[in-house]
Amino acid sequence: MENLIIYAFIYLLGSIPFGLILAKFFAKTDIKKEGSKSIGATNVLRVVKEKNPKLAKKLAIATIILDFAKAAIPLLILKFLHYDQALLWSVAVLAIFGHCFSIYLLFEGGKGIATGAGAMIVLLPLEVLTAFIVWVVIGKIFKISSLASLAALLAFVISSFIFNYDLEIHTHAPVFIIAFIIVYKHLPNIKRLIFKEECKVI
């Protein structure tokens, strides 16, 4: 019963659309109706930037921090309390799933990058550092957020095998689940990348 309560709480916490809330409260803008219609930092930046560039950057940074924290902080607390790895990984997946398929938004949501990073920094910090370096490099070169995010995700998955080469394949199942969720949410971006229609944001 305790685990079920934790899982429910984490999903509800992960579902909180901070980007949407911040944009509505501070910029009086509904990002679900503009831009890519995503609730993540990239769409916050893209949409609010048209009205107030300085505010857009602040709100985008705040969105990243809050989306990151809603996964990282609960996991840090649970890890400190010595909960087992199975529960920690379940919590990580649920936090990301909640962000991407929010119960408050009729199971729509963001792309899962910041929340995923928040979860994985607790469980696989070296892999996240590797992914972050790739994200920065690709972002600097191409200036396309989705491309940088997908490249970082690929680097994360590959490095999870390199840094944990002695683990059996089934132990990577949560990583595959998380990667699948994020790739699924990026399918429209992938389509635009293929047809060279994706906008530059970074």
Curated annotation (Swiss-Prot):
Lineage: Bacteria, Pseudomonadati, Campylobacterota, Epsilonproteobacteria, Campylobacterales
Membrane topology: Multi-pass membrane protein
Catalytic activity: an acyl phosphate + sn-glycerol 3-phosphate = a 1-acyl-sn-glycero-3-phosphate + phosphate
Keyword Protein biosynthesis attached: no
Localization terms from the record: Cell inner membrane
Superkingdom, taxonomy of origin: Bacteria
Entry's Gene Ontology cellular component terms: plasma membrane
Protein family membership: Belongs to the PlsY family.
Keyword Lipid biosynthesis: yes
GO biological process: phospholipid biosynthetic process
Protein name from the UniProt record: Glycerol-3-phosphate acyltransferase
